[in-house]
Amino acid sequence: MTILVVDRYYMLMNLLFALTCLLLNLTHCFSPKKFNISAATTSDSDWSIAGSTWYGNPTGYGSDGGACGYGNAVAQPPFSKMVSAGGPSLFKSGKGCGACYQVKCTSKSACSKNPVTVVITDECPGCVKESVHFDLSGTAFGAMAISGQDSQLRNVGELQILYKKVECNYIGKTVTFQVDKGSNANSFAVLVAYVNGDGEIGRIELKQALDSDKWLSMSQSWGAVWKLDVSSPLRAPLSLRVTSLESGKTVVASNVIPANWQPGAIYKSNVNF
């Protein structure tokens, strides 16, 4: 008799539960496995925490090119002053030059909470308070603010931000090579810029004019500058093969350095990642 009463009690409770779900249109009452816990987390779940400061002119581009070697190009499109010096974990002894990151601030009233994209163009060797630190240009730091409150945000000076690495996408740009002003036929160095995708360079190789010539590995000189010293004069035109640091993808800029190349000249390829 007791078992019968209990069974009827549970049948009644199940019926009431089903009716409640129908009335409230709670379809997940019947399929709890469809509930995705990730959907209940914040949109910041794929972001990481970093420290940030800014340097240089309040509306400037940090320093003149900095430790990557880009020179005054950082003030012009496509960089457009939206650049940053990186602490050791971002600069990576120069291998981090050209990497693109989205950064945003959410902790201050002047923060827009909207991400902006910056490129690593300089080094901040003393930025070691946090494991990851962006020393942004004044322009980039202010770009994280609500419109009209960039000065207010810069006055904070030091700020905790959120960041994530993103692919670089220099619209309309191809990989560009600037021959170092000190280069000659036996000691050739080149600055590499506007690399899409990873942005970071893992390897540069050079091939001389003849089809039979082999690819020669260049070494990183400093920042985004790579060099090759040879005993016999290089025979131009020269082709350059660029391998990205993270993905390992490769592009070849065939005959990008012409036979009559000049130190300091800029040569644009017709390739990019």
Curated annotation (Swiss-Prot):
Disulfide bonds join C68-C97, C100-C168, C105-C111. One of its GO terms (cellular component) is membrane. Glycans are attached at N36. InterPro entries: Expan_Lol_pI (IPR007118), Expansin/allergen_DPBB_dom (IPR007112), Expansin_CBD (IPR007117), Expansin_CBD_sf (IPR036749), LolPI (IPR005795), RlpA-like_DPBB (IPR009009), RlpA-like_sf (IPR036908). It is found in: Secreted, Cell wall; Membrane. Residues 186-269 form the Expansin-like CBD domain. CDD domains: DPBB_EXPB_N. Pfam families: DPBB_1 (PF03330), Expansin_C (PF01357). Transmembrane segments: none annotated. Residues 1-29 form the signal peptide. Keywords: Cell wall, Cell wall biogenesis/degradation, Disulfide bond, Glycoprotein, Membrane, Secreted, Signal. It is a peripheral membrane protein. Residues 65-173 form the Expansin-like EG45 domain. GO terms for biological process: plant-type cell wall loosening; sexual reproduction; unidimensional cell growth. May cause loosening and extension of plant cell walls by disrupting non-covalent bonding between cellulose microfibrils and matrix glucans. No enzymatic activity has been found. Belongs to the expansin family. Expansin B subfamily. This is Putative expansin-B2. It comes from Arabidopsis thaliana (Mouse-ear cress).
